From Swiss-Prot:
The lineage of its organism: Eukaryota, Metazoa, Chordata, Craniata, Vertebrata. It comes from Pongo abelii. The modification Aspartate 1-(chondroitin 4-sulfate)-ester is found at residue 637. GO terms for biological process: hyaluronan metabolic process. This is Inter-alpha-trypsin inhibitor heavy chain H3. GO terms for cellular component: extracellular region.
Length: 876
């Protein structure tokens, strides 16, 4: 579910940073253009979704213009599925693109608060609440500015009652000139049904605004209401787009399972059909304390009466009621015969609220009843037991410590059957209910206090009403897979689906086999799925229709989700390890999870960047002002700048080599990243190095692991991505995004990021074309290197790890403005001179002065070895 309540245009206007808030209404503002309020116009909102094998990649784009003559703050609250992870958030301000970076939560929060305190345009995307239900972005929009917000999120669509459901919350609350939802679905198994509907408009009124179709493996849904179709009446200026837009579909199932393999990762879907239902033994543990009085208890009764209608004759049940004490309908479980069900209805109708809340004793009574029924053979041998508890508050009598109740319940169940906890309303410790359910192989649901609470309760029961298998184990060939997600389940319920993903040890295997074992209603079953790898390639040959390495991302998504669940009940070292693994994957795959946040700030305003690398202009005596964090760049003749934050100072050296020479700037054997630069000379033909200026005219950035190369020259940027070539001009404003990579060109500035922790900036320096001596050249900045390994080397890379130096004996030099000194570094004693360079990262024309100590003789004594050790034969 993505609520466009604010991302779509229900904007809360004013300014967080000094401007008064002024909420607006469209009604009655006839003098304003349609869709404009308080000077802000949301003129476009689009949702583009690509679903590949249940994995949905969704991009929400909203375009806003501030017509006012003062800055305005725009706040967006975006409702998403609780299981979705945001993967990217991009601001485009007046045509300039600023991407988000996923960071550890506290790091992102500090960076955002610093930007806001300085009055800078900044947006923070963070998980809010228990289950990632809401993401908030606030941005200060300058007068006359256009801002585009692009939010990307991914989720695995879960099968629910026989259908996959994509749920979009649509609430623009004003007319939007261009509003559209486009959904493309690709399912290798073939699509068996596809539907779409909106809660805010009847199917008759949807008319031409909605189109839906499916054939074979592909499905498509489009919703594009015109301005007239958005109005509740012909003269209205508000919008009727306010509610749910739901897409449902299912796939063909020629066999119970389906395995798909792409680039060494696999996903296994399992959903058998036509099996007999396993009889179930249900202990309903119901809170009837005083707080349940009135509508809550009445809705609970209505739901239980409906559930009794669905009970099968083979099922067994009992009701355990708890308040200050515990009472039961029967002494033990009874079969769901017509006579017993009628008696149960009478009992449910008679339930009355009273007293306190004794969760511990209520649960233990229900669990004991199930255990005893099994021990005394009162229930069928091939049956399964379930505890369903409903409460609206916290324990306040008897054992009331949550951790002790959890321990008691865990010991009593002993892993034999699941516990499902239903939390009614908001006045309860939901985390406690959720954690207790998760560690007992169940889950928790919040039942919202609303008119449909009884339907919510009944809907939950329908999910678990028909177990088809128990004790499910998914097995693969020994030593053939790595990093497997959860592959054992206590139950498989009708209408659901089991999803397992992992990594293949050998990508070149010819076939792949998967076995699923489980206990059915009448016998034990084994389902075998064998995959021919060549046939698999044919089935997935329509790769243009799907996005990227979707199975790898699906695997990462599932792994993170399951690590976070395990983490909730872990302690000490185990919890630390689970947290570290989940955080590492969240950062690697750019997922916003409870451990991470995403922050966007204008790069030229952001002073939090860890490191920077640039190459200034022809003035060798430019200057340098070191920031507080490590800073590296290469510039000029070329000049290399190395900042050491521990010293609040910087070092500089030149490399004098002939035009055409290629130098190794960065090489990291662990991440596969390399950066090389080729030297060019000025326009003079003289080979005299004392007078001839040299610069970097060409850069090669490559990542062997990602099969990615980019060649940057003063004329163009050429990208090779898995053998696909793309060429861009420096005049282009373009962004390229793929798993783990973003590349943005904005006139004389290019930003290349490899996930979180590695970011480079290339600056184009242009001179007058008819200048008799100078020519265009490039500057290279390292703005973040903290994710590069300790084995990184190169003329710049060797300094990414901390090192120490000492400056002493400062004395007058040949130039009174540039003192000399003695530098002790790496066991070498060197003569250095104070000078300055320029950082052109913020302004390619003027630059910013930064002071440094200059090391002579091509950096000898400062760099490892000699400078000729860094000469390489070519860019790649």
């Amino acid at each position: 579910m993505v609520a466009l309540s604010h991302l779509g245009s229900a904007l809360q206007l004013g300014s967080l940073w000094g401007f008064p808030r002024s909420p607006f209404r469209l009604l009655g503002k006839r003098s304003l253009p349609e869709g404009v309020a308080n000077g802000i116009e949301v003129y476009s909102t689009k949702i583009n979704s690509k679903v590949t094998s249940r994995f949905a990649h969704n991009v929400v784009t909203t375009r806003v213009v501030n017509h006012a003559d003062t800055a305005k703050e725009v706040s967006f609250d975006v409702e998403l599925p609780k299981t979705a992870f945001i993967t990217n958030f991009t601001l485009t301000i007046d045509g300039v693109i600023y991407p988000g970076n996923v960071k550890e939560k506290e790091v992102a929060k500090k960076q955002y608060e610093k930007a806001v305190s300085q009055g800078k345009t900044a947006g923070l995307v963070k998980a809010s609440g228990r289950k990632l239900e809401k993401f908030t972005v606030s941005v200060n929009v300058a007068a006359g500015s256009k801002v585009t917000f692009e939010l990307t999120y991914e989720e695995l669509l879960k099968r629910h009652k026989g259908k996959y459901e994509m749920y979009l919350k649509v609430q623009p609350k004003q007319l939007v000139k261009h509003f559209e939802i486009e959904v493309d679905i690709f399912e290798p198994q073939g699509i068996s049904m596809l539907d779409a509907e909106a809660s805010f408009i009847t199917n008759d009124l949807l008319g031409s605004a909605l189109t839906k179709s499916f054939s074979g493996k592909k499905g498509h849904v489009s919703f594009k209401p015109s301005l007239d179709q958005q109005r509740p009446c012909p003269t209205c200026t508000d919008s009727l787009l306010n509610g749910d837009f739901t897409i449902t579909y299912d796939v063909n199932r020629e066999s119970p399972g389906n395995v798909q393999i792409v680039n060494g990762y696999f996903v296994h879907f399992f959903a058998p059909q036509g099996l007999p239902v396993v009889p179930k033994n249900v202990a309903f543990v119901i809170d009837i304390s005083g707080s349940m009085a009135g509508r809550k208890l009445e809705q609970t009764k209505e739901a239980l009466l409906r559930i009794l209608e669905d009970m099968k004759k083979e099922d067994y049940l009992n009701f355990i009621l708890f308040s200050g004490d515990v009472s039961t309908w029967k002494e033990h479980l009874v079969q769901a015969t017509p006579e017993n069900l009628q008696e149960a209805r009478t009992f449910v109708k008679s339930m009355e609220d009273k007293g306190m809340t004794n969760i511990n004793d209520g649960l233990l009574r229900g669990i004991s009843m199930l255990n005893k029924a099994r021990e005394e053979h009162r229930v069928p041998e091939r049956s399964t037991s379930i505890v369903i508890m409903l409460t609206d508050g916290d324990a306040n009598v008897g054992e009331s410590r949550p951790e002790k109740i959890q321990e008691n319940v865990r010991n009593a169940i002993g892993g034999k059957f699941p516990l499902y906890n239903l939390g009614f309303g908001n006045n309860l410790n939901y985390n406690f209910l959720e954690n207790m359910a998760l560690e007992n192989h169940g889950f928790a649901r919040r039942i919202y206090e609303d008119s449909d609470a009884d339907l919510q309760l009944q809907g939950f029961y329908e999910e678990v009403a028909n177990p088809l298998l128990t004790g499910v184990e998914v097995e693969y060939p020994e030593n053939a897979i790595l990093d497997l997600t959860q592959n054992t389940y206590q139950h498989f319920y009708d209408g659901s689906e089991i999803v397992v993903a992992g990594r293949l040890v050998d990508e070149d295997m010819n076939s792949f086999k998967a076995d699923v074992k489980g206990h059915g209603a009448t016998n034990d079953l084994t389902f075998t799925e064998e995959v021919d790898m060549k046939e698999m390639e044919k089935a997935l040959q329509e790769r243009d229709y799907i996005f990227g390495n979707y199975i790898e991302r699906l695997w990462a998504y599932l792994t993170i989700e399951q690590l976070l669940e395990k983490r909730k009940n872990a302690h000490g070292e185990e919890k630390e390890n689970l947290t570290a693994r989940a955080l590492d994957l969240s950062l690697k795959y750019h997922f916003v999870t409870p451990l991470t946040s995403m922050v966007v700030t204008k790069p030229e305003d952001n002073e939090d960047e860890r490191a920077i690398a640039d190459k200034p202009g022809e003035d060798a005596e430019a200057s340098y002002q070191p920031p507080q964090n490590p800073y590296y760049y290469v510039d000029g003749d070329p000049h290399f700048i190395i900042q050491v934050p521990e010293k609040d100072d910087a070092l500089c050296f030149n490399i004098d080599e002939a035009p055409g020479t290629v130098l190794r700037l960065i090489q990291d054997p662990v991440t596969g990243l390399t950066v090389n630069g080729q030297i060019i000379g000025d326009k003079r033909g003289s080979p005299d190095s004392k007078t001839k200026k040299t610069y970097f005219g060409k850069l090669g950035i490559a990542n062997a692991q990602m099969d990615f190369q980019v060649e940057v020259t003063t004329e163009k940027v050429t990208l090779w991505n898995r053998a696909v070539q793309s060429t861009f001009s420096w005049l282009d404003t373009v962004t390229v995004m793929q798993d783990g990579l973003s590349m943005m060109i904005n006139r004389k500035n290019m930003v290349v990021s490899f996930g979180d922790g590695v970011t480079f900036v290339v600056v184009l320096h242009q001179v007058w074309k008819k200048h008799p001596v100078h020519r265009d050249f490039l500057g290279f900045y390292v703005v973040d290197s903290h994710r590069m390994s300790a084995q990184t080397h190169g003329l710049l890379g060797q300094f990414f790890q901390p090192f120490d130096f000492k400056v002493s004996d400062i004395r007058p030099g040949s130039d009174p403005t540039k003192p000399d000194a003695t530098l002790l570094v790496k066991n070498h004693q060197l003569i250095v001179t104070r000078g300055s360079q320029k950082d052109y990262r913020k302004d390619a024309s003027i630059g910013t002065k930064v002071v440094r100590w200059f090391v002579y003789n091509n950096g000898e004594g400062l760099i490892d070895g000699v400078h000729t050790d860094y000469i390489v034969p070519n860019l790649f």
